[in-house]
From Swiss-Prot:
Organism per entry: Bacillus subtilis (strain 168)
Protein name per Swiss-Prot or TrEMBL: D-alanine--D-alanyl carrier protein ligase
GO cellular component: cytoplasm
NCBIfam families: AA-adenyl-dom (TIGR01733), D-ala-DACP-lig (TIGR01734), PRK04813.1 (NF003417)
Job of this protein: Catalyzes the first step in the D-alanylation of lipoteichoic acid (LTA), the activation of D-alanine and its transfer onto the D-alanyl carrier protein (Dcp) DltC. In an ATP-dependent two-step reaction, forms a high energy D-alanyl-AMP intermediate, followed by transfer of the D-alanyl residue as a thiol ester to the phosphopantheinyl prosthetic group of the Dcp. D-alanylation of LTA plays an important role in modulating the properties of the cell wall in Gram-positive bacteria, influencing the net charge of the cell wall.
Gene: dltA
Length: 503
């Protein structure tokens, strides 16, 4: 596999270059290669037979976990990343559904809840195996699964998205070729490794010979701590959700002065608000900003566009860009028929980045994946349209609601609320106590203002909204907060916000 061979070459050519670093920890390319060899040999001793069962890797982003990822695939097994935010009950379901036989964990972690269901070993114990390696013909093959990411399932049980070595290689080659990330750059990692945004940091970094700078969980939740850490990092490449960088932008100190070497920002996982893009262009004039799009089932991202002031001026919402060269993206109607350019429907992705399907879930796989003109395709469940070859994503089809007979997109309403001069950030939640939407609630982080009463602020925002939205799309209720709740993955936590707002 090209990715693994590239890491091996870096280990031989630049053995003392850091592949990974975090507070007080580092791992050179030579150490990464040699330790992952030892881990692979130890794994093969623990799991006998031809069955290539998945291996759970449990912990947080640190050297031994990356060693465990590579050790697993060198031993011929896919890995399942499980970070500390995943509750034990969910881990037990993942073990049961995946058929995993081995769990590798970081030192000092309590795993009592799953200990009886699966063989467990600390990453440190694996590395006690002196010497040892496996031959390259034991590595995960191109058509075999490299990693499995578990996402939420509509049944309440997590579903495992299988990403093959070929899927990952297609993605990594694209990032290294089409984005300014090569040449030993320093990449940010802030996403937990059970979220596939972390794949955008990790593997392009390792293939290009860069250094992955992982910020601590404490820093992720505290901007002041984060900025102190980043100031010393020499960071070049920033990858995150828009929500995470929006939180950083709330501090005026987040700018090119803080990160003088930052030259590339890449966003994925959510809609990139125009206001965030504008602020970044102002704060980081030396950097290029890229909006990307893709579901986990299509290996992180499959479209991109560089965001400039010219791009911003051409449309109310930002495009997610053009398909990567080896992919085909089209729009389908409810009957599964392709739609012409400009018409709205469901985004469908076809090509070598599309997952082989859900592990052990043939019915779910058949529902979401299908063959299209000789290519494997995935129905995303995202609404969008194509204009002049560029894809515009309009959020989830299941973010569409019906209120008083009108069908509307929550994200369209959010866009207009965020455009208000009085709004720093906002989320719109439907109030539907009996399954039917009765009205809309806007949860808002306000800008500084001179109003003495909240109702005065609400009136001012509603007056602005009335200029761009019909009355039935304007939220009835406005709730003011000091921040917008986010999930461990750095996305807006709509479920939690809804629960808090409705109390």
């Amino acid at each position: 596999m090209k990715l693994l061979h590239a890491i091996q070459t870096h280990a031989e050519t630049y053995p003392q270059t850091d592949a990974f670093r975090s507070q007080g920890q580092s791992l050179t390319y030579q150490e990464l290669w040699e330790q992952s060899d030892r881990a692979a040999a130890a794994i093969q001793k623990r799991i006998s037979g031809e069955k290539k069962s998945p291996i759970l890797v449990y912990g947080h982003m640190e050297p031994h976990m990356i060693v465990s990822f590579l050790g697993s695939v060198k031993a011929g097994h896919p890995y399942i990343p499980v970070d500390l935010s995943i509750p034990s009950e969910r881990i037990a379901k993942i073990i049961e559904s995946s058929g995993a036989e081995l769990l590798i964990h970081a030192a000092g972690l309590s795993i009592d809840a799953v200990g009886q269901q699966i063989q467990t070993v600390s990453a440190e114990e694996l590395l006690e195996n002196e010497g040892g390696s496996v031959s390259q013909d034991q590595w995960v093959k191109e058509h075999e699964t490299f990693y499995i990411i578990y996402t939420s399932g509509s049944t309440g049980n997590p579903k495992g998205v299988q990403i093959s070595a070929a899927n990952l290689q297609s993605f990594t080659d694209w990032i290294c070729a089409d984005f300014p990330v090569s040449g030993g750059k320093i990449f940010l990692n802030q996403a937990p490794f059970s979220f596939d945004l972390s794949v955008m940091d990790l593997y392009p970094c390792l293939q290009s010979g860069g250094t992955l700078h992982c910020v601590t969980k404490d820093a992720v939740n505290k901007p002041k701590v984060l900025f102190e850490e980043l100031k010393k990092s020499g960071l070049n490449v920033w990858t995150s959700t828009p929500s995470f960088v929006q939180m950083c932008l709330m501090d005026p100190g987040f700018s090119q002065d803080l990160l003088p070497h930052a030259d590339t920002f890449m966003f994925c996982g959510e809609v990139l608000p125009v206001s965030v893009a504008k602020a970044l262009l102002e704060r980081f004039p030396k950097a290029k900003i890229f909006n990307t799009y893709g579901p986990t089932e299509a290996t992180v991202a499959v479209t991109s566009v560089e965001i400039t002031n010219d791009v911003i001026s051409r449309s109310e919402s930002l495009p997610v860009g053009f398909a990567k060269p080896d992919m085909n993206i089209f729009i389908m109607d409810e009957e599964g028929q392709p739609l012409p350019e400009g018409e709205k429907g469901e985004i469908v992705i076809a090509g070598p980045s599309v997952s082989r399907g859900y592990l052990g879930e043939p019915e779910l796989t058949e529902k979401a994946f299908f063959s299209h003109e000789g290519q494997w395709a995935y129905r995303t469940g995202d609404a969008g349209f194509i204009q002049d070859g560029q894809i515009f994503c309009q959020g989830r089809l299941d973010f569409q609601i019906k209120l008083h007979g009108y069908r509307m997109e929550l994200e369209e309403i959010e866009f207009h609320v965020r455009q208000s001069q009085y709004v720093r950030s906002a989320v719109v939640i439907p109030y539907q106590p009996n399954g039917t939407v009765e009205y809309l609630i806007a949860a808002i982080v306000p800008e500084e203002h001179e109003f003495e009463k909240e109702f005065q602020l609400t009136s001012a925002i509603k007056k602005e909204l009335a200029a761009s939205l019909p009355a039935y799309m304007i939220p009835r209720k406005f709730i003011y907060q000091d921040h917008i709740q986010m999930t461990a993955n750095g996305k807006i936590d709509r479920k939690r916000i809804g629960e808090e707002v409705l109390v």
